[in-house]
Amino acid sequence: TIFGTFNKGIKDTNRIAIIGGIATEFGISSKIPSGFDGIPVLNPLQATFYGFKDDRKTDDIDNLWSLFEAALALADNDTEEKRQEFSDAYDKVHDQYCIRWNITMGLYWIRPYTFINLDSRNRWFIADVHNMPAEFVVAVEKKLKNAPYAADYLEIRDLCKKALDTNEYEYKNF
């Protein structure tokens, strides 16, 4: 949700200003980006990953934090144990209010070389045999109809990474 405050359909100058405010507030000294090409954006009217107080359950925000931690752990060390922890957290968040494909954007934002964003543009792109191998498209096509649960999400990610690792495409990562 923090990333959603600036990764939404607003002008780049506003995105930069929001990031600058966050950096100042939290004492972050990293360079503020000046361009956002290729970064998926949320609908500005749905830029949070949780509902307002009356629309969310008491553990919704804690569940998001658990997924964040599990995603970082999986990105750092991809083991069966870490995959299970990630899957448990992801599946718990999957059915929460305000969660759909946007959860894949959030994962991409925190570790873009590990997690694939499945927004509508990427789904269209990877489901086209002109962009990805035919066997990949056949394997994932049905999994792209609805926001996937963890097992399907990880399978899509793994198959996509495998296809990109063949070096048959000019693009090499998510």
Identify the function of each model-found stretch.
Residues 103-110:
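Short hydrophobic alpha-helical segments that form membrane-spanning helices or hydrophobic packing faces
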Residues 1-96, 112-174:
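An N-terminal alpha-helical hairpin/helix-loop-helix interaction module that forms a charged
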